[in-house]
């Protein structure tokens, strides 16, 4: 029975999501809220924690693998390895901390550098702690402008109230899925072209 369960899970589509952003912006809180429906306020700084969950995405059962990475500068060197394995990224800042918003530029540049061979990288800009509106330092207009400049979606979340938590993970999975489908289509198209060319060559020889 366990073997069948593992077999079923391994046959599900797996989408790999990486959480990036400065320390203390709530990456772990967002992840834990999505995974377990609970708000964890005090959380030890993360080096890298991995989580996996089975979800239903637009009627299809899939698995999401979430890697929650450290925002601290001490871990900057090892982030490259984590970024290479990622298929989609949630670039998180706190709306109550201007510095964390400014830092998203550097995180995105690191992602683009590591994934330089890829075309469009699935990424969402996420402004967390929307429940702390009275302490806001980053305006919605400023964040939207940055997202528009990057060609990505901007969403505000609250790990505390769970506002838009599911939305950011599911929207990102949709982008990852669309990219995979596009890449598979391109591969199949090239393969088909090679087969036709090979067939024409064989016909000429005959």
From Swiss-Prot:
Propeptide feature: residues: 204-206
EC number: 3.6.5.2
Alphabetized InterPro entries for the sequence: P-loop_NTPase, Small_GTP-bd, Small_GTPase, Small_GTPase_Ras-type
CDD domains in alphabetical order: RalA_RalB (cd04139)
SUPFAM superfamilies referenced in this protein's UniProt entry, alphabetically: P-loop containing nucleoside triphosphate hydrolases (SSF52540)
Assigned keywords, A-Z: Cell membrane, GTP-binding, Hydrolase, Lipoprotein, Membrane, Methylation, Nucleotide-binding, Prenylation
Classification via PROSITE patterns: RAS (PS51421)
GO CC annotations on file: plasma membrane
Residues linked to a lipid group, S-geranylgeranyl cysteine type: 203
Compartments in which it is found: Cell membrane
Residues recorded as bearing Cysteine methyl ester in the entry: 203
GTP-binding among keywords: yes
Top-tier EC class: hydrolase
Record field: compositional bias (Basic and acidic residues): 180-189
Gene Ontology terms, MF aspect: G protein activity; GTP binding
Annotated family: Belongs to the small GTPase superfamily. Ras family.
NCBIfam families: small_GTP (TIGR00231)
Classification via PANTHER family: RAS, DI-RAS, AND RHEB FAMILY MEMBERS OF SMALL GTPASE SUPERFAMILY (PTHR24070)
Record protein name field: Ras-related protein O-RAL
Organism encoding this protein: Diplobatis ommata
């Amino acid at each position: 029975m366990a073997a069948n369960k593992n077999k079923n899970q391994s046959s599900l589509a797996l989408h790999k999501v990486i959480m990036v952003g400065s320390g203390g912006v709530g990456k772990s809180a967002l992840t834990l809220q999505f995974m377990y429906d609970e708000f964890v306020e005090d959380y030890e700084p993360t080096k890298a924690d991995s989580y996996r969950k089975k979800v239903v995405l637009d009627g299809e059962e899939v698995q999401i693998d979430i890697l929650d990475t450290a925002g601290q500068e001490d871990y900057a060197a090892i982030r490259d390895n984590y970024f290479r394995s990622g298929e989609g990224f949630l670039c998180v800042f706190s709306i109550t901390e201007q510095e964390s918003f400014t830092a998203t530029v550097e995180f995105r540049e690191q992602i683009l550098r590591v994934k330089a061979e890829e075309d469009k990288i699935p990424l969402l800009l996420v402004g967390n702690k929307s429940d702390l509106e009275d302490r806001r330092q980053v305006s919605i207009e400023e964040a939207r402008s940055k997202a528009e400049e990057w060609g990505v979606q901007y969403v505000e979340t609250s790990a505390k109230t769970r506002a838009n938590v599911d939305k950011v993970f599911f929207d990102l999975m949709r982008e990852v899925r669309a990219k995979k489908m596009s890449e598979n289509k391109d591969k199949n198209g090239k393969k088909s072209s090679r087969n036709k060319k090979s067939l024409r060559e064989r016909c000429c020889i005959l």
